[in-house]
Design a protein with these regions (language model features):
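Active-site beta->alpha N-cap acidic-glycine motif
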Residues: 47-171, 274-277
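Terminal accessory/targeting
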Residues: 1-75, 91-100, 159, 207, ...
């Protein structure tokens, strides 16, 4: 073979090899990259921003803040009304611009005074449950007897207030009374308190007692001094008083009681304001 032919063939072979190499490299560069250690489901797709709507800022709904109570507060509460005493109590409260809480009864003997509940609500006072009969031997026979009494109370006051919305109550004799043991046994009050809480209601005791229903018809001055003495150094007070037919002097003492608490820097709250439910 002549030298010239040899050189031509060698040049052609070199060109073929170069073309093949270029073809291989082009194929490799066009192949998708392989990401070591990731599966397709592990990769986060990149959105096509050209078709996305502008971002919308959605405000975060904050939990409602719990009400902040004054450092010193007092709840004036009245049991066993309404009665002929209630108008005088309402007059004293309204004159002072003070709201109170009434734990009411509906015994069948005070029916003509029940319309006063509407007046009390209109003036901004709170109505709460006490008892229909206030007969310990009846209401504390059993849990069923107690709740039957409450149902009767709600039925009797329903024409005058929104009875179904009431979620506060006071046990006759208080939550730690021992008289209930005679009729329903030692564990009855514990059971009743648990049942009240299961309903999402609130039972309410007191830490200041006016001692206006202990018998002997205490004078207005005695009732006033009882309240001042029992308040002592306490800064959060729930005062037990009565607006029953036999506690007329409570209404007489009320202006001085209100004035004394105001002078001591107490804010006047209803029970619902001081002990909010949920």
């Amino acid at each position: 073979m002549k030298r010239s032919e040899y050189l031509v063939r060698r040049r052609r072979a070199r060109v073929a090899v170069m073309m093949l190499f270029a073809l291989i490299m082009g194929f490799v560069s066009a192949a998708p990259p392989v990401v070591t250690g990731c599966q397709a489901q592990d990769l986060t797709p990149v959105p096509d921003t050209s078709v996305l709507s502008p971002a919308i800022s959605v405000p975060v709904q904050a939990e409602p803040a719990a009400p902040v109570l004054p450092e010193k507060w007092v709840c004036l509460t009245f049991d066993d009304g309404p009665s002929k005493t209630t108008p005088d109590v309402l007059n004293a409260l309204n004159a002072a611009g003070v709201h109170a809480t009434f734990f009411v009864v509906a015994t069948g003997h005070n029916e003509k005074y029940l319309p006063l509940l509407t007046e009390a609500v209109s003036a901004g006072h709170q109505i709460a449950l006490h008892s229909a009969s206030h007969e310990y031997s009846d209401i504390y026979r059993s849990s069923e007897a107690y709740w039957a009494d409450i149902a009767l109370l709600k039925e009797r006051i329903a024409p005058y207030v929104d009875a179904e919305s009431i979620r506060y109550l006071r046990f006759p004799g208080g939550s730690t009374n021992t008289v209930s043991r005679r009729y329903g046994g030692k564990g009855l009050m514990k059971q009743l308190k648990a049942e009240v809480e299961q309903k999402g209601w609130q039972w309410v005791d007191w830490n200041v007692c006016a001692e206006d229903a202990v018998g002997g018809h205490p004078s207005a001055d005695t009732i006033y001094r009882n309240v001042v003495r029992e308040t002592g150094q306490q800064t959060n007070c729930i005062v037990l008083m009565h607006d029953s037919a036999t506690t007329r002097t409570t209404a007489e003492a009320l202006p001085d009681i209100i004035r004394w608490y105001a002078d001591q820097g107490f804010a006047f709250l209803t029970v619902a304001e001081a002990l909010p439910i949920g």
